[in-house]
Amino acid sequence: SLGGKKIIDLEKALREIDILSMSVPLTDDTRNMISYKQISLMKKNAIIINVSRGGVVNESDLNTALDKNIISFAGLDVFEKEPPDTNNPLLKNKRVLLSPHAATFTKECLENMSLETAQNVINFFNGKIEKTKIITL
């Protein structure tokens, strides 16, 4: 138990949830973490949302599960191959909502990144950044 919430294993969670929102890095442990086996455990009205990294959800298995009505819907803004091939069946699947993986393209985010970068340059020239924190190529 963590913070009063019971921790359950992934298979049990998949059987119970309505929406699976993926937000994990792509590692050896998370590659194809959600494949046909896991999807087939989910409710028929379940929705998968992957906004983390392509490769976490097996795209071929997801498309098959959607075509077989194993789950109802998917929302994706990442793909195994980016940009995705134009023949990727998920691009044409009517039960998939696609959006660009572009959270940093808002005006506010771009402005904040620009200001932070400028401040880091000023800090560097004023000796406020330790040399061990500087990455050289």
Indicate where each model-derived feature is located.
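Rossmann-like dinucleotide/phosphate-binding beta-alpha-beta segment
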Residues: 1-44
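Rossmann-like dinucleotide-binding domain for NAD(H)/NADP(H)
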Residues: 45-47, 51-137
